From Swiss-Prot:
It comes from Cereibacter sphaeroides (strain KD131 / KCTC 12085) (Rhodobacter sphaeroides). Transmembrane segments: none annotated. The keyword Cytoplasm applies. Forms oligomers. GO terms for cellular component: cytoplasm; nucleoid. This is Transcriptional regulator MraZ.
Length: 168
């Protein structure tokens, strides 16, 4: 079984837009980077789609997604949408020697991090979601989490009840 991105981490984003990738996520990124041999590891940051966060995939996971997109008939609306939002609006990222990345301008725009917020310092939340992780502006993530739980579960309900629909 492949390694998974698990957990939730709040990380400072400095004035130069540098942010440290959580150490447990770095291990999964390394395991999913076929070219990694002890130096710098890489992953793919996707900023496409109608959402307020970016999604990050290991190189291996992104290759699987690309194969699935390639299997769709050329020129179909589904394929064009996926190509645009998963391939065109994506960047290869490389961790520096300290395990950091510079959040690219398009990623900062997607997260809603303004230049003024960078100057004053801001925080990003990294959320593991099995085969990928998300990067959110911390305050937006907290608000989204609260709203999502309110919609999906009544107070005191067992969250595993959501799996009943899958038959697992």
């Amino acid at each position: 079984m492949a390694e998974a991105f698990r957990g939730e981490y709040n990380q400072k984003v400095d004035a130069k837009a540098r942010v440290s990738i959580p150490a447990p996520f770095r291990r999964v990124i390394e395991a999913g980077d076929p070219k990694f041999s002890g130096g710098r590891s890489s992953f793919v940051l996707v900023y496409g789609g109608d959402r307020s966060y970016v999604e990050c995939y290991t190189i291996s996971e992104m290759e699987r997604i690309e194969e699935r997109i390639r299997s769709l008939p050329m020129g179909t609306p589904k394929r064009r949408y996926l190509e645009r939002n998963m391939i065109t609006l994506a960047l290869n990222m490389e961790l520096d020697e300290d395990g950091r990345i510079v959040l690219p301008p398009k990623g900062r725009e997607k997260l809603g991090i303004s230049p003024d917020e960078l100057k004053g310092g801001t925080e990003a939340t990294f959320a593991g979601t099995l085969n990928k992780f998300q990067i959110w502006k911390a305050d937006i993530y907290a608000a989204e989490l609260a709203a999502e739980e309110e919609v999906l579960l009544p107070p005191g309900a067992d969250m595993l009840s959501l799996l009943e629909e899958t038959g697992l």
